[in-house]
Swiss-Prot record:
Entry-linked PROSITE patterns: PGM_PMM (PS00710)
Designated name of the protein: Probable phosphoglucosamine mutase
Reactions mediated catalytically: alpha-D-glucosamine 1-phosphate = D-glucosamine 6-phosphate
Residue positions binding Mg(2+): 96, 233, 235, 237
GO biological process: carbohydrate metabolic process
Function recorded in the entry: Catalyzes the conversion of glucosamine-6-phosphate to glucosamine-1-phosphate.
Family per record: Belongs to the phosphohexose mutase family.
Keyword annotations of the record: Isomerase, Magnesium, Metal-binding, Phosphoprotein
Length: 449
């Protein structure tokens, strides 16, 4: 991890870590890296996004880049526009699910996949050097504005077909998804009820679409007797789902269900997920001809493995899904359309979810300054291997140790000053016992680091 880029691009507090001055330099660095070309730029609804976008575009133009500004746009729309306009790259101004005082910058390749760590490292090198490409007055890049929403919906309707109409409640969380997700659902032929659908940087609910933040969505689904509720984070690269009974469907369960549906839709193949995904996915997709491949946390790692192995679906247990037949950009909006197609073909989610194996999953966060993370992980690795009776070790991203009926993942956050502990066990007592031991170990490691 470099000075600027984490697991999801550049992210931090506006006017502290992420400033207009930095955005200007990032624009220059991207233009220098590309040597010109064409770049699509979009932003989320945060109050600071317009300021950062303007600075970034200035930097791009100064290096001779042609900029297509699509304005307020969910991340999936930026990824789609990159391919639609045959751009060399794309940039999104967003902090995704982080609180409103945060913002960030994420760069995308011409195929819709996020920049890899190696590509980001090269951008960092250019940023640090200050040796930016400069063009004369008559070669400054051109700026034009575009709106790819109509084309996005048209293409999506070619891939997703419904036989019946459903009542869908869409909670966009005041984020960028509000300009697209409800409209796609309506064009699919559904009756749409919108919540938090006015774009605003003053978010009404917590942006991460989880059981707590979606209590309003769940209540609306029950009251309106809707078939499903769909929610997004700030840039709509994630999806959260509430079933027809008004219950939030755990990320692990939805990941398994949609992976299984993709296997039914496209035939047997490889499913890519991350090291923090549990046993349920493997157990659910194996009978359907699915082979699970695990990789580092982050959509770029998932997209990279999908491309390498020709996988048919990739997703994280955070509601981040990548559908390679559509794009290599994580897309919560297109995912919502697929959820409706799954309901149309297989039945209510409440019934489908009962088929997914359930294990006990616990998560914890331990505060840890960023400068202590590397040393703390060294201590954790050494102590965890001594303290737990494990059968398998995966160290591609943090430390994951497994036994036949449990696993634990110790991993430093790439976006926050915390250490994350994720674990799963077959029983609640075992899960609590493991978490108590794991938390104690991590707190001691941070203290010693």
């Amino acid at each position: 991890m470099g000075r600027y880029f984490g697991t999801s691009g550049i992210r931090g507090l506006f006017n502290e870590c992420v400033t207009p001055e930095l955005a200007l330099k990032v624009g220059k660095a991207v233009g220098t890296y590309l040597g010109g070309g064409r770049v699509v730029v979009g932003m989320d609804t945060r109050t600071s996004s317009e300021t950062l976008k303007s600075a970034l575009i200035s930097g791009l133009l100064s290096t001779g880049v042609e900029v297509i500004d699509i304005g307020l746009a969910p991340t999936p729309l930026t990824g789609f526009a990159i391919k639609l306009y045959e751009a060399d790259a794309g940039v999104t101004i967003t902090a995704s699910h982080n609180p409103p005082e945060y913002n960030g910058i994420k760069v995308w390749q011409s195929n819709g996949m996020a920049y890899t760590p190696d590509m980001e490292a090269e951008l960092e090198r250019i940023l640090e050097s200050g040796n930016f490409r400069k063009v004369p007055w008559n070669e400054i890049g051109t700026l034009r504005r575009a709106d790819p929403r109509e084309e996005y919906i048209r293409k999506a309707l070619e891939m997703v077909k419904l036989n019946d109409s459903y009542t869908v409640v869409v909670d966009s969380g005041n984020g960028a998804g509000s300009i697209l997700s409800p409209y796609l659902q309506r064009e699919l032929g559904n009756k749409v009820i919108s919540l938090n659908s006015h774009p605003s940087g003053f978010f009404v609910r917590e942006l991460e679409p989880n059981a707590k933040s979606l209590s309003g969505l769940a209540k609306t689904v029950r009251v309106m007797k809707a078939d499903v509720g769909i929610a997004h984070d700030g840039d709509a690269d994630r999806i959260g789902v509430v079933d027809d009974e008004g219950n939030f469907v755990e990320y692990e369960v939805m990941l398994s269900l949609i992976a299984g549906y993709m296997l039914r839709k496209f035939g047997k193949g490889k499913i890519v997920t991350t090291v923090d995904a549990g046993f349920a996915l493997d157990d659910y997709v194996r009978p359907l001809g699915g082979e699970v491949i695990r990789t580092r946390v982050g959509d770029v790692a998932v997209a990279d493995e999908l491309a390498k192995h020709g996988g048919i679906f990739g997703g994280e247990p955070s509601g981040t899904w990548i559908i390679p037949q559509w794009n290599l950009t994580p897309d919560g909006i297109f995912a919502g359309a697929l959820v409706l197609e799954m309901i149309d073909r297989l039945g209510p989610i409440s019934e489908l979810a009962r088929e997914v194996p359930r294990y006990v999953t616990l998560r914890a966060k331990v505060p840890c300054p960023n400068e202590k993370k590397a040393k703390a992980m060294e201590i954790i690795a050494k102590e965890a291997l001594k303290s737990f009776d494990y059968e398998k070790l995966i160290d591609i991203d943090g430390i994951r140790i497994e036994n036949s009926d449990w696993w634990i993942l110790f991993r430093p956050s790439g976006t926050e000053p915390i250490m994350r502990i994720t674990l799963e066990a077959h029983t609640e007592d075992k899960a609590k016992e493991l978490m108590e031991k794991a938390e104690k170990l991590v707190k001691e490691a941070v203290r010693r680091a």
